[in-house]
From Swiss-Prot:
This is Adenylate kinase. PANTHER family: NUCLEOTIDE KINASE (PTHR23359). Residues 30-59 are annotated as: NMP. Coiled coil: none annotated. Residues 122-160 are annotated as: LID. Monomer. Pathway: Purine metabolism; AMP biosynthesis via salvage pathway; AMP from ADP: step 1/1. Its EC number is 2.7.4.3. GO terms for molecular function: adenylate kinase activity; ATP binding; zinc ion binding. Keywords: ATP-binding, Cytoplasm, Kinase, Metal-binding, Nucleotide biosynthesis, Nucleotide-binding, Transferase, Zinc. GO terms for biological process: AMP salvage. It comes from Rickettsia felis (strain ATCC VR-1525 / URRWXCal2). ATP binds at G10, A11, G12, K13, G14, T15, R123, I132, Y133, K196. It is an enzyme of class 2 (transferase).
Length: 212
């Protein structure tokens, strides 16, 4: 099974990707995480990618496509995966279809701009276990103590400020809305209400994928 999660930054793709991947025992491939890992390396490619991220610009298709292809053609992904954040436009979708022949399901997370901004601005995670929190909606039960592992060290994403987030949303709309129209005609396109809580969204996705 190959499942693509589409939606703007802050839509909840990463949270649901991890949940559903664990439930159906498939890898969750988060494109943002892949590129954040690359940025931490001391390479010219990392510097180039980091410049795009800082400015709120999308990374060029040729860079994204090659990185993703290298990942997806690995043997560990031969049985399927949940793909979070790719493709983001028609060019990427057609490149993806050129080397992936399996049937896919596309799930789009529909969320208002106002809610997206709060979700992204408030987002942080436990540095030890990766548990995601939000200063607006989901704080640890005990201040500065992770609910899962008890760590008191948290990671706040440096590229998350309101101006950059708004720009990322607008760039996303320009790039991705034509892709959504393209996938709507595929017969395997589904929309979930991303403003619901985590449990409700998870249930909606399980129904789409026909899993318990």
């Amino acid at each position: 099974m190959i499942v693509i999660f589409l939606g703007p930054p802050g839509a909840g793709k990463g949270t649901q990707g991890k949940k559903i991947a664990k439930k159906i025992d498939l890898p969750h491939i988060a494109i943002g995480d892949i590129f954040r890992t690359i940025i931490k390396t001391s390479t010219s490619e990392a510097e180039l990618i980091n410049n795009y991220v800082k400015q709120g610009e999308l990374i060029p298709n040729e860079i994204v496509n090659q990185v993703i292809k290298n990942f997806l053609l690995s043997s560990e992904y031969k049985n399927g995966y949940i793909l979070d954040g790719y493709p983001r436009n028609l060019e990427q979708a057609k490149f993806f279809e050129s080397f992936i022949k399996e049937k896919i399901k596309i799930i789009y997370f529909d969320v208002s701009d106002e809610l997206l901004i709060k979700r992204v601005l408030g987002r942080y995670s436990c540095k030890n276990c990766g548990k995601i929190y939000n200063s607006y909606f989901l704080q640890p039960k005990t201040d500065n103590v992770c609910d899962v592992c008890g760590s008191s060290t948290f990671d706040y994403r440096k590229d998350d400020n309101e101006e950059v987030i708004k720009k990322r949303i607008e760039v996303y709309k320009t790039e991705t809305y034509p892709l959504i129209d393209y996938y709507k005609n595929s017969g395997n396109f589904y929309i979930v209400d991303g403003s619901k809580n985590e449990q409700e969204i998870e249930i909606d996705i399980q129904k789409i994928l026909k899993i318990n």
